[in-house]
């Protein structure tokens, strides 16, 4: 299931290894009884403890050759569960730091009997650096990351040039990176950064149509009715 660290763990070392700035703030969320029960009963089965060793993803899911997709920051996990249910041929690794969201997704894993989904409750940058092998991912989902809309907080944004280079090192040739946001200025920021990465190419002229596999969230549906926009940005690894 795991092997000693190899490969390109030092991508963006100057900017990432000593990173005092994180893209998230841990908040003390309240757990429901159902979420706590799911954490107690299902985290030992579907959770992957953080450790600085490279995962053998085929062994982790018990099958070889299936496409592997990483989702960073899955929130309460509703979209994650729906995507995993609709694509049983793919295996999904969800990374999230907030305990209520982890409990919520575990609850859905149990209800839907999903065997193609695993959870790592840890900082995504450290997971990428120390647990994901180079050229091992077929896709990466980053849906509605915190836009940190105040200019003085832009340094906290997840999508930065060094982070994108790290992602590219973990993606296979032909793998896709899909970012979705409902904050237009952040969409422009993401598009600009991804366009500057020489290892990525845009699958559209600018923003992409929403793929069928990404479900509409309740929040997104409410925003659409109010005339708010959502921007999907999909690039492919060269």
Curated annotation (Swiss-Prot):
EC number: 2.1.1.33
Alphabetical list of InterPro entries matching this protein: SAM-dependent_MTases_sf, tRNA_(Gua-N-7)_MeTrfase_Trmb, tRNA_methyltr_TrmB_bact
Entry keywords, A to Z: Methyltransferase, S-adenosyl-L-methionine, Transferase, tRNA processing
Catalytic activity: guanosine(46) in tRNA + S-adenosyl-L-methionine = N(7)-methylguanosine(46) in tRNA + S-adenosyl-L-homocysteine
Positions annotated as active site in the UniProt record: 146
Pathway terms, separated by semicolons: tRNA modification; N(7)-methylguanine-tRNA biosynthesis
Enzyme class: transferase
One cellular component (GO) term of this entry: tRNA methyltransferase complex
Residues involved in substrate binding: 150, 182, 217-220
Top-rank lineage group of the source organism: Bacteria
Residues engaged in binding S-adenosyl-L-methionine: 71, 96, 123, 146
Molecular function GO labels: tRNA (guanine(46)-N7)-methyltransferase activity
Matching Gene3D superfamilies: Vaccinia Virus protein VP39 (3.40.50.150)
Family indicated by similarity: Belongs to the class I-like SAM-binding methyltransferase superfamily. TrmB family.
PANTHER family in the cross-refs: 3-DEOXY-D-MANNO-OCTULOSONIC-ACID TRANSFERASE/TRNA GUANINE-N 7 - -METHYLTRANSFERASE (PTHR23417), PENTACOTRIPEPTIDE-REPEAT REGION OF PRORP DOMAIN-CONTAINING PROTEIN (PTHR23417:SF14)
Reported function: Catalyzes the formation of N(7)-methylguanine at position 46 (m7G46) in tRNA.
HAMAP family assigned to the protein according to its UniProt record, in alphabetical order: tRNA_methyltr_TrmB
Protein name in the entry: tRNA (guanine-N(7)-)-methyltransferase
Organism, scientific name: Methylobacillus flagellatus (strain ATCC 51484 / DSM 6875 / VKM B-1610 / KT)
Classification of source organism: Bacteria, Pseudomonadati, Pseudomonadota, Betaproteobacteria, Nitrosomonadales
